[in-house]
């Protein structure tokens, strides 16, 4: 007779799954800040090829949840912006 059976069957899979989800969420959030910075710089470089803009008036935000990540970009382009040929 196994003594561990007296205490009931342990259900470690749900706990392990939850710990893994927390770990992945933490890794995604730490990588997310670097990713947002890189995306911001690349997006600004592309926009600046066509239009002159103030880099301080650009905001990039990344939101992550368990199913999807969204990237929100807010670029203020002045009405009198100089348009450049590509």
Curated annotation (Swiss-Prot):
InterPro entries: MinE, MinE_sf. Gene3D superfamilies: Cell division topological specificity factor MinE. It comes from the Bacteria. SUPFAM superfamilies: Cell division protein MinE topological specificity domain. Keywords: Cell cycle, Cell division. It holds the Pfam family MinE. One of its GO terms (biological process) is regulation of division septum assembly. Transmembrane segments: none annotated. Prevents the cell division inhibition by proteins MinC and MinD at internal division sites while permitting inhibition at polar sites. This ensures cell division at the proper site by restricting the formation of a division septum at the midpoint of the long axis of the cell. HAMAP family: MinE. Belongs to the MinE family. This is Cell division topological specificity factor. The lineage of its organism: Bacteria, Pseudomonadati, Pseudomonadota, Alphaproteobacteria, Hyphomicrobiales.
């Amino acid at each position: 007779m196994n003594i561990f059976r007296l205490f009931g069957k342990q259900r470690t899979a749900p706990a392990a799954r939850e710990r893994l989800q927390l770990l992945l969420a933490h890794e995604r959030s730490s990588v997310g800040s670097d990713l947002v910075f890189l995306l911001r710089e690349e997006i600004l470089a592309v926009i600046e090829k066509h239009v002159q803009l103030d880099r301080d008036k650009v905001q990039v935000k990344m939101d992550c949840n368990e199913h999807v990540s969204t990237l929100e970009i807010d670029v203020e382009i002045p009405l009198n912006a100089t348009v450049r040929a590509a």
